[in-house]
Amino acid sequence: MPAPPFKITVLGSGTSVGVPTIGCHCAVCTSTDPRDNRLRPSILISYEGRNVLIDTTPDFRTQALRAHIERLHAVVFTHAHADHAMGLDDFRPFNFRQSGDIPVYAAPDTMNSIRRCFPYIFDSEEKKTNVPHIEPRLLDGSPFDLFGLKFLPIPILHGPHTIYGFRFGNAAYLTDHSEIPDSSMDLLRSLDVIFLDALRYKPHPTHSTVERSIKTVEKLGVRRAFFTHICHDLGHERAEIGRASCRERV
């Protein structure tokens, strides 16, 4: 069965501290270009009247209001670092508006880390009070179905840690990667759209660079690519000029 048509909304594409960065007076952080205002990285996938969120950033409340998200049907976590998980408590308004617990998908180590951060959300007694109501579902690396759309976990390296990116239909979302193993590259063939980590131009121990991610796009032959987890080293206008001069897909 073919994947249902879906819409991807980019809720944030900034690095862990966001852009502008607190206390910074560089050209990007003081830019008046709204495209240089980047919240923490997350996307929303909408289809068949459903909304599936990848990661709950500390900016999630702002992101939900900006994108007019009124209902949330499932959440998928890439990993448990603060810039990807600390917005979980902002689920409460969705519980007020819709019945039932919201399914939350994550690898076992990611779920355990989130549980340690938010023990009251996982406590059955606390569920009787005004806390987010979720249904934890553990990922084992196998494909899983969400409302007719298949999601495939893609193992990627975030420094010394293995985390998940996800392929869904003809698209894939990979953030916070310093390396994509060959076995995972094989799972990313025949894509139309990909989101890749591109923190900055200079090398970083736990994140990809612009040039490295461009090479990944070329190797995969993806029709269209978007970069995310971008820091204040990259102003949008300058990056777009550089992109137009060297690569058509990105």
Give names to the regions the model predicted:
Residues E179-R247:
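Cap/insert and terminal regions of metallo-dependent hydrolase folds
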Residues L139, I156, A198, I230, ...:
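Hydrophobic pocket-lining residues within nucleotide cofactor-binding pockets
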Residues M1-L174, S183, R238-R247:
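Binuclear metal-dependent hydrolase catalytic cores
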